[in-house]
From Swiss-Prot:
Catalytic reaction list: GTP + H2O = GDP + phosphate + H(+)
Class of enzymatic activity (EC top level): hydrolase
Ligand binding (GTP): 40-47, 87-94, 152-155
Xref: Pfam families: Ras
Family according to the record: Belongs to the small GTPase superfamily. Ras family.
Chain segments carrying region Disordered: 205-226
The protein's name: Ras-like protein family member 11B
GO biological process: negative regulation of transforming growth factor beta receptor signaling pathway
Organism: Homo sapiens (Human)
Description of what induces expression: By TGFB1.
Tissue expression summary: Widely expressed with highest levels in placenta and primary macrophages.
Amino acid sequence: MRLIQNMCTIAEYPAPGNAAASDCCVGAAGRRLVKIAVVGASGVGKTALVVRFLTKRFIGDYERNAGNLYTRQVQIEGETLALQVQDTPGIQVHENSLSCSEQLNRCIRWADAVVIVFSITDYKSYELISQLHQHVQQLHLGTRLPVVVVANKADLLHIKQVDPQLGLQLASMLGCSFYEVSVSENYNDVYSAFHVLCKEVSHKQQPSSTPEKRRTSLIPRPKSPNMQDLKRRFKQALSAKVRTVTSV
């Protein structure tokens, strides 16, 4: 597995509508591109989640999250896709409202899907989910962006502040998939959360028909010859031949 870490921050992304953004569905080697942003409060394990998914390794300590972009290839239903995963700095809350920088908003607009992460050891991170989900959907008006809610640190039951069942109920109410994971102990659950998003985005990107089929459908099919008309022409030709033989 090849992993490329591009040391670029969300501030460096092309704004929606730019030429670079218009080609956002095509990745390296012409493969379809899937873009996922990982968001949530500070300290919930976003970076650990991303690195665990991409490398299968767990690293406990990280430097302050600067918003790095990671790229790899994934297999979804037999097709190789180019996947980009954007790690993001922790979201803050001021006076019961989200404080999202424009750089973070651009990252969310850039994404084809979003992972919202909270920690079962931090009730405030759980309280962010509804506001954050609403904010994500507001930045994608006119389309239903695929979102997965992930409850991290499931192994730390001795300091649990949030029952995972609450996360499941909230995710269901918001129309999102839900995964309870322990990034430090279980790779499979982490993989499943990202895989279901990649699959959903892949299905949304697939056109109803291929360009070749669409072009073919525009070409009028030749009309089938009328059988009665053919019989009439055949009789006329046969009668003419009989008259010619008789005259001779």
